[in-house]
Swiss-Prot record:
This is Sphingomyelin synthase-related protein 1. It catalyses: an N-acylsphing-4-enine + a 1,2-diacyl-sn-glycero-3-phosphoethanolamine = an N-acylsphing-4-enine 1-phosphoethanolamine + a 1,2-diacyl-sn-glycerol; an N-acylsphinganine + a 1,2-diacyl-sn-glycero-3-phosphoethanolamine = an N-acylsphinganine-1-phosphoethanolamine + a 1,2-diacyl-sn-glycerol; an N-acyl-(4R)-4-hydroxysphinganine + a 1,2-diacyl-sn-glycero-3-phosphoethanolamine = an N-acyl-(4R)-4-hydroxysphinganine-1-phosphoethanolamine + a 1,2-diacyl-sn-glycerol; N-hexadecanoylsphinganine + a 1,2-diacyl-sn-glycero-3-phosphoethanolamine = N-hexadecanoyl-sphinganine-1-phosphoethanolamine + a 1,2-diacyl-sn-glycerol. CDD domains: SAM_SGMS1-like. It holds the Pfam family PAP2_C. GO terms for cellular component: cytosol; endoplasmic reticulum; endoplasmic reticulum membrane; Golgi membrane; membrane; plasma membrane. The active site is at H301, H344, D348. It is a multi-pass membrane protein. GO terms for molecular function: ceramide cholinephosphotransferase activity; sphingomyelin synthase activity. Its main location: endoplasmic reticulum. It comes from Homo sapiens (Human). PROSITE patterns: SAM_DOMAIN (PS50105).
Length: 415
């Protein structure tokens, strides 16, 4: 029989546990643990000090309890991956193994709003082991993250509707664009100081497309792709909905004479809808032949560039420095090209960057700390966030897997 050190602990039998106990110097407990209570490798890993003190074991010697638990804890640290796969937290004090089932159950009733304590009272247990996690190199506790595909579908529908509504608002503001002879471009420090580069705006969209392809690859390979897509759609839709409001209420003059924008009147609602569909289907990009006027406050291109950059850097490991640097370079160069092309005022770009980054950070701060569950007011102020995130427990770990099933020939080759 192979020794315990030569065999995966999943395959340990009671005989292997007996050998391990003897090696650790616990001869007197071989009979009660292995013969009477049939402890194998997996059950040995989940052994706690409470188990040793309580029936049916009831070990009376305190020194033996402590020494045995020290040996078990060493074993748990060696086989931490096995514990995590089983959903146990091995970092709780006193060697206790706290299953995450109870945490998930508590999340359900909190998600439904049935709190058993004062909602506005002090927040407790937010720093407990079950929520400790940092994306990157640090270890994290394993949680079951339900993909909830139906919510992801709803978020996709939401963002497509918002994009369609944004396209229609862009048609409306094009009709109301101020006359260039009466309302010349507003003074702008950057635009007045930097000469226009004609090809710069096309380069902005190239930067955006590269970022989009990088994000799609990350999304495809990420284990929790459904949650990531849901968050992207909800955030992108919310920012563009705010953009609709700012575009509609105030019409800024054209930022440059090169644009040659004039108010264009569409005769009927159907013509407006047809033009809105053309903008929507072309993603509002000049590379697809879409040219718009009047949609200045704030920059939609900056929103897309910044949002994609933040999602790429958030949902990839911190050690991927090259990818993060590339993402930021594309984001910042894309913003520079927008201004260099004189397609937007500087304030358009600044406001777009600020709103996008703040909304992203606020959303993920609430999602990662679970603080919103402790306040009824948070659910009132952020209803969509509460709906989409109520069953997501803490930070989403950066885990990757191949999304497609292996072909039969590959399965035979690699087993």
């Amino acid at each position: 029989m192979a020794g315990p050190n030569q065999l995966c602990i999943r395959r340990w039998t009671t005989k292997h546990v007996a050998v391990w106990l003897k090696d650790e110097g616990f001869f007197e407990y071989v009979d009660i643990l292995c013969n009477k209570h049939r402890l194998d490798g997996i059950t040995l890993l989940t052994l706690t000090e409470y188990d040793l003190r309580s029936p049916p074991l009831e070990i009376k010697v305190l020194g033996d309890i402590k020494r045995l638990m020290l040996s078990v804890r060493k074993l748990q640290k060696i086989h931490i991956d096995v514990l995590e796969e089983m959903g146990y937290n091995s970092d709780s004090p006193m060697g206790s193994m706290t299953p995450f089932i109870s945490a998930l159950q508590s999340t359900d009733w909190l998600c439904n709003g049935e709190l058993s304590h004062d909602c506005d009272g002090p927040i407790t247990d937010l720093n407990s082991d079950q929520y400790q996690y940092m994306n990157g190199k640090n270890k994290h506790s394993v949680r079951r993250l339900d993909p909830e595909y139906w919510k992801t579908i709803l978020s996709c529908i939401y963002v497509f509707i918002v994009f369609g509504f944004t396209s229609f608002i862009m048609v409306i503001v094009h009709e109301r664009v101020p006359d260039m002879q009466t309302y010349p471009p507003l003074p702008d420090i950057f635009l007045d100081s930097v000469p226009r580069i004609p090809w710069a705006f096309a380069m902005t969209e190239v930067c955006g497309m590269i970022l989009c392809y990088i994000w799609l690859l990350v999304l495809l390979l990420h284990k929790h792709r459904s949650i990531l897509l849901r968050r992207l759609c909800s955030l992108m839709g919310t920012v563009f909905l705010l953009r609709c409001f700012t575009m509609f209420v105030t019409s800024l003059s054209v930022p440059g004479q090169h644009l040659q924008c004039t108010g264009k009147i569409y005769g009927s609602v159907w013509e407006k809808l047809h033009r809105a569909f053309a903008i929507w289907s072309g993603f509002g990009m000049t590379l697809t032949g879409v040219h718009t006027c009047g949609d200045y406050m704030f920059s939609g291109h900056t929103v897309v560039l910044t949002m994609l950059n933040f999602f790429v850097t958030e949902y990839t490991p911190r050690s991927w420095n090259f990818l993060h640097t590339l993402s930021w370079v594309l984001n910042l160069f894309g913003i520079f090209f927008i201004l260099a092309a004189h397609e937007h005022y500087s304030i358009d770009v600044f406001i777009a960057f600020y709103i996008t980054t703040r909304l992203f950070l606020y959303y993920h701060t609430l999602a990662n700390t679970r603080a919103y569950q402790q306040s009824r007011r948070a659910r009132i102020w952020f209803p969509m966030f509460s709906f989409f995130e109520c069953n997501v427990n803490g930070t989403v770990p950066n885990e990757y897997c191949w999304p497609f099933s292996k072909p039969a020939i590959m399965k035979r080759l690699i087993g």
